[in-house]
Each structure stands twice: as structure tokens, then as C-alpha cells.
From Swiss-Prot:
PANTHER family membership: GTP CYCLOHYDROLASE 1 (PTHR11109:SF7), GTP CYCLOHYDROLASE I (PTHR11109)
Pathway entry: Cofactor biosynthesis; 7,8-dihydroneopterin triphosphate biosynthesis; 7,8-dihydroneopterin triphosphate from GTP: step 1/1
Catalysed reaction, written as an equation: GTP + H2O = 7,8-dihydroneopterin 3'-triphosphate + formate + H(+)
Annotated keywords: GTP-binding, Hydrolase, Metal-binding, Nucleotide-binding, One-carbon metabolism, Zinc
Upper taxonomic lineage: Bacteria, Pseudomonadati, Bacteroidota, Flavobacteriia, Flavobacteriales
Gene Ontology annotations for the cellular component aspect, listed alphabetically: cytoplasm
Name under which the protein is recorded: GTP cyclohydrolase 1
């Protein structure tokens, strides 16, 4: 019989979840961003003091506030649904019927297990069923879902599901190739490895269509 803490240590980097949503509490937005920053600032101060750091030193006395603002306003800003980009779509007046691929979208996210960076590229494609979306909106959707504590599998699914909803079609695909600093800089410390995840919907489940998409992106990510 192991306790819950031992269990969490045992599963380590194993990824499991009941759905594609981030695990947020119901009261996640009961306080303002400014209140969150103040609370996190005090928590970071406590961590640094516990580590023995001198918070009167000019180099780090502003660190708690910087970290708190970074968490709330920047790297975890995608947790706030008020910041979700508007996925405007338009009629496919050109009657373009082939797949559209947006390659090499920059991914900056954060591993929710160790709060270390995930850095990589996303490749997203869809086949229009009558609606099209602005190219930059695809980048913004990737950025929005990346700016939160994440696992790469969930991020890949969220991007596809958001585009499926916006475009009114199942014919959406996403591949992400990313480095996880929780693997590269700690633990096994394998600086060469990267993680590839994929999600294929609708016509992209067809082997020929999937092959066409993969040929377009020619996965060889440069980090």
C-alpha cells in the first residue's frame, strides 16, 4: 500500500488524463489577476527564502514580483478564457478544396509536471468544408493553448478541437515536435531527444491524406 505522494513519484512523467481539458478548479477566476500576482509573489518569496537566498540582494529582490507577473500575464496567460483569441472564419469564396497547411508554428509551453519549458514547432492543417480561417488565427490558437501548464498530448488535441469547432469540420490535423526541458536538463538529461505528438481528424485519418500532410511538413525540426 503506497500513499498518494509515493504514487505520484512512481508514475513520474506518465501522462494520463480523463479528457482534453486542463485541470482547473471551479474557483480559478474568483480573484483578479492582480490578486493572483500578490499571492504568487509571496509564495515565490517563501521558496527563495527556504532555499537560503538573500532577498535583500539587488540581483534577486525583484525576482518574486517578476516571476508572479510572468506566471499570470505571460506563460500561463492561456488559462484565462478571457484571453482566448477570436477564431473568425470566412466563406471559402475561392472554392479551394485541397488541404491548407501552416508549418513551423512556434510553440512555447510549460510542462505541468516540473514547470519547465516545452519548446518546439506545431504543424497544423485543415480541409475546408465551406469555411476558412485567417492564417494568423491558427498561430494564435496554438499560442493560447500553449500558454498554460501542459502535457504535449493534450495541447495537440486542444488545437485540433478548437479548429474543428471554428471551421465546422472534422478535417483537421496537428503534429507537434518539441523538446521538454524536464527531460533535456534534469533527470535523464538527454539533450538530443524530442517528443512528437499527432492528432488526425476526419479525412486526415485516411492513410493517403495523412501521408500527403506528413510529406508537406517533412518533419525535421530545427531547435
Amino acid at each position: 500500500m503506497i500513499n498518494n505522494e509515493d504514487f505520484l513519484d512512481e508514475i513520474g512523467d506518465s501522462h494520463f488524463s480523463s479528457n482534453a481539458k486542463n485541470p482547473l478548479r471551479e474557483d480559478a477566476f474568483d480573484i483578479t489577476d492582480e490578486e493572483k500576482i500578490e499571492k504568487i509573489k509571496k509564495d515565490v518569496e517563501n521558496i527563495l527564502q527556504t532555499l537560503g537566498m538573500d532577498l535583500t540582494d539587488d540581483s534577486i529582490k525583484g525576482t518574486p514580483n517578476r516571476v508572479a507577473k510572468m506566471f499570470v500575464k505571460e506563460i500561463f496567460g492561456g488559462l484565462n478564457p478571457a484571453k482566448q483569441p477570436k477564431a473568425s472564419t470566412f466563406d471559402n469564396n475561392y472554392k479551394y478544396g485541397e488541404m491548407l497547411v501552416e508549418k513551423n508554428i512556434t510553440v512555447y509551453s510549460t510542462c505541468e509536471h516540473h514547470l519547465l519549458p516545452i519548446i518546439g514547432r506545431a504543424h497544423v492543417a485543415y480541409i475546408s468544408s465551406g469555411r476558412v480561417i485567417g492564417l494568423s488565427k491558427m498561430n494564435r490558437i496554438v499560442e493560447y493553448y500553449a500558454k498554460r501548464p501542459q502535457v504535449q498530448e493534450r495541447l495537440t488535441m486542444q488545437i485540433v478541437q478548437e479548429l474543428q469547432k471554428a471551421l465546422g469540420t472534422e478535417d483537421v490535423a496537428c503534429v507537434i515536435d518539441a523538446k521538454h526541458l524536464c527531460v533535456n536538463s534534469r533527470g535523464i538529461k538527454d539533450i538530443e531527444s524530442s517528443t512528437v505528438t499527432s492528432e488526425f481528424g476526419g479525412k486526415f485519418k485516411d492513410p493517403q491524406t495523412k501521408r500527403e500532410f506528413l510529406d508537406y511538413i517533412k518533419l525535421d525540426t530545427q531547435f
